[in-house]
Regions:
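Long, internal low-complexity/basic segments
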Residues: 2-9, 13-16, 21, 43, ...
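Active-site-proximal cap/lid insertion segments
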Residues: 5-6, 18-28, 161-164, 172-285, ...
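A short aromatic-rich beta-strand->coil structural motif
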Residues: 11-17, 95, 107, 167-170, ...
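Short catalytic/ligand-binding loop motif for oxyanion handling, primarily in non-cytosolic enzymes
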Residues: 20-24, 53-58, 69-72, 102-104, ...
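Short, structured active-site-proximal loop/turn typified by the sulfatase FGly-forming signature C/S-X-P-X-R
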Residues: 22-58, 64-65, 69, 99-103, ...
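Catalytic-site neighborhoods of secreted/periplasmic enzymes
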Residues: 60-166, 172-196
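Substrate-binding rim/cap in mid-to-C-terminal beta-strand-loop elements of soluble/periplasmic
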Residues: 62, 69, 127-135, 271-274, ...
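C-terminal, low-complexity/hydrophilic appendages and adjacent surface loops
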Residues: 186, 312-313, 395-498, 554-555
Length: 573
């Protein structure tokens, strides 16, 4: 039986952007808002974001469908990605159908909304900020999160309905300001790096604090045991954002310290919202969800950023829920997915699982509500680290990180519109193809990964091999494979999925492959390539190793051939 309408809770989602939830905070870091929520609610240790990048992850969060299935498999800032179709049901439209008033404040990044409070009505959300989207450009967290907090408090105080339950998203940018940080002059991007012109030094603000920073245990991973796609990701971020030279651990500590301060800034904004909940005595009628769209590598494996990387730092996000019916200060090792958010919201809105399946058949997520309200007596629907089950699916199909050697010829920079108006049209892809040729579509830099809390299997593949292998021989014939024991090897440095390496476990590969195939079949469906291989009007790869090395940052070394490709400029760390 559905929950009585007058007992259904309000739902407030506090969303941050790009926090490394695995980071051990040094002594002296105070996060009063986040610490209060953790102390008052239930936190999941294994919540996966499904795609570790802004637009795709937010598409999943607010539609309940995998990003590729709604056309948002890369950021809307790139020419090959459209905006979210208003015909796609969202959490806003679905909850409106259940009688909720739905509103959205802050970072959206699924379209290019007009500067109007009605800009998201077509997506099921009212009361958007009239000054437009804060998509996450340089220093936008510092500059605009305070305004989002003000808008949220004002809405709670003056605009929230009193006659029906409501759903409100308050979506901050920080700690995303870490994305464009340049820790010092020696952290140098490639001259043609797509993000080079956007980087900035640390801010000299009175609010900032210096902490006793330690580097993560897997910082010194030499990546020799990792698949080609991992090393390609490293080149991509080094060249486009900035490479820290060997021996400059001080700059890595600057980055980690800056990320903490960005988190402190967003915590201060969340505190304003929690204070308003106190003033209006809303805790007894409101479920508060604290989460993030994705993580941040933050020095893990000697890397920065997020995107085409399946490691825990980028793919696991914070997930804390304070519910009027839930316990306080509890933790669970349950595995969850951002695909589950929409289903869980609808459960709080009073729908039973059978009703959700009937009314919204496109939703493939699980209901996390039982484990979030009673973690000690509920069986997690995806299993847990202590009792593994189906696990969670993590994907990558983004062209922006497919081929870093092609990107730094200047191609990616010409196809990115980072906050300067509408995306370039697909005709620009043809123009760029004429100038630079195509990216190498044989590079194995896309992935499908499954984590059940105990183990993680990653299938790295190229855009030409979208078929789903169902046997171990098929898997190795079409893919680079990684398998990690997350209990024995939490830093993911020992790949036991590579037949050429010691410790290879074929039986475990087969077991995890079965889980991966099951999630692809039941959640993604037909796993087809979301773009045309002839997108650039050619498939010719024109760059040569010397083209890259000529203008590379100092100390770069050329050449590691990639799978199925000609010689490629390579792994210089």
């Amino acid at each position: 039986m559905s929950t009585a309408r007058d007992e259904r809770p309000n739902i407030l989602v506090l969303c941050m952007d790009q926090w490394d939830v695995h980071m051990d905070l040094p002594p002296g870091v105070e996060l009063p808002a986040i610490q209060r929520l953790v102390g008052a609610g239930v936190s999941l240790a294994n919540q996966y974001c499904t795609v570790p990048q802004c637009t795709p992850s937010r598409a999943i969060m607010w539609t309940g469908q995998h990003a590729k299935n709604v056309g948002l498999w890369d950021n809307t800032n790139f020419a090959w990605t459209d905006v979210l179709d208003e015909a796609v049901p969202t959490v806003g439209t679905m909850l409106r159908e259940q009688g909720y008033y739905t509103a959205f404040k802050g970072k959206w990044h699924l379209s290019h909304p007009e500067r109007s409070s009605d800009a998201l009505e077509g997506y099921g959300f009212s009361d958007y900020q009239s000054w437009g989207d804060n998509w996450g450009g340089p220093l936008q967290g510092e500059e605009l999160d305070g305004t989002v907090a003000f808008e949220t408090v004002d809405w709670l105080r003056h605009k929230r309905p009193r006659d029906r339950p409501w759903f409100l998203v308050s979506s901050m940018v920080n700690p995303h300001d870490i994305m464009f940080l340049r820790a010092g002059p020696d952290e140098r991007p490639h001259a043609n790096g797509a993000m080079a012109a956007l980087t900035h030094p640390p801010q000299d603000l009175g609010f900032m604090r210096e902490y006793d920073i330690e580097l993560p245990g897997n910082f010194s991973d030499d990546l020799e045991a990792q698949p080609y796609g991992v090393r390609s990701y490293k080149r991509n971020t080094d060249w486009n954002y900035g490479r820290i030279p060997e021996g400059r651990e001080d700059l890595w500590k600057v980055r980690r310290n800056y990320l903490i301060n960005c988190l402190r800034m967003v915590d201060a904004e969340f505190q304003k919202i929690l204070d308003e909940l106190d003033r209006q005595d809303l805790w007894r009628s409101t479920v508060v969800v604290l989460t993030s769209d994705h993580g941040e590598m933050n020095g893990g494996h000697g890397m920065t950023q997020k995107g085409a990387i399946p490691f825990q730092e980028a793919s696991i996000v914070n997930m804390t829920v304070v519910s009027p019916r839930g316990p306080s200060g509890d933790h669970s090792d349950a595995v969850g997915s951002h695909l589950d958010l929409a289903t869980t919201f609808l459960s709080w809105a009073g729908l039973e699982q059978a009703d959700i399946r009937e009314r919204y058949p496109a939703l493939k997520g699980r209901n996390l509500r039982p484990v979030l309200e009673d973690p000690r007596r509920s069986d997690p629907p995806r299993g847990s680290a202590s009792a593994p089950g189906d696990g969670a699916l993590v994907n990558w199909d983004g062209l922006n990180m497919l081929d870093p050697e092609w990107a730094i010829q200047g191609a990616l920079g010409e196809l990115a519109q980072l906050g300067h108006g509408p995306d370039r049209t697909l005709e620009d892809c043809l123009r760029v193809g004429e100038t630079y040729g195509a990216p190498d579509m044989d590079k194995r830099t896309f992935f499908r990964a499954v984590s059940d809390g105990r183990h993680k299997l990653v299938r790295w593949f190229s855009p030409t091999r979208y078929e789903t292998p169902r046997t171990v021989p098929e898997l190795h014939a079409t893919s680079d494979v990684a398998l990690y024991d997350l209990l024995e090897d939490p830093g993911e440095t020992n790949n036991i999925g590579d037949p050429s390496r010691p410790g290879y476990d074929e039986e475990l590969v087969a077991s995890m492959l079965k889980k991966l195939v099951h999630l692809i079949d039941t959640e993604l469906g037909e796993d087809e390539r979301p773009f045309d291989l002839d997108l650039f009007g050619t498939r010719e790869v024109r760059y040569r190793p010397e083209d890259v090395a000529t203008d590379a940052p100092a100390e770069e070394q050329p050449a590691e051939p990639g799978p199925g490709t000609t010689e490629q400029p390579g792994d210089a760390f």
